[in-house]
């Protein structure tokens, strides 16, 4: 097998694996994961500088490469 053919098959396999691993549900791509700001439980948003609007967040703290956002009374 030539090196070109091997690289082509590697790229095709990688694209197929990436498409299967991507979430199909729109809601899955828009929600965060649980996190903690000290004693307060929040939602972690990856690669965000500030909390997204429309979710009722009143506070946040920095986490590695993202934000942990929490609503009032959490």
Swiss-Prot record:
Keywords: Cleavage on pair of basic residues, Disulfide bond, Ion channel impairing toxin, Nematocyst, Neurotoxin, Potassium channel impairing toxin, Secreted, Signal, Toxin, Voltage-gated potassium channel impairing toxin
Top-rank taxon: Eukaryota
Claim: Glycoprotein is one of the keywords in the record: no
Listed GO CC annotations: extracellular region; nematocyst
Protein's UniProt keywords contain tRNA processing: no
Compartment(s) of residence: Secreted; Nematocyst
InterPro entries, sorted: BDS_K_chnl_tox, Myo_ane_neurotoxin_sf
Primary location: secreted
Range of residues in the leader sequence: 1-21
Function field: Potently and selectively inhibits voltage-gated potassium channels Kv11/KCNH/ERG. Acts as a gating-modifier toxin that shifts the voltage-dependence of ERG activation in the positive direction and suppresses its current amplitudes elicited by strong depolarizing pulses that maximally activate the channels.
Name under which the protein is recorded: U-actitoxin-Bgr3b
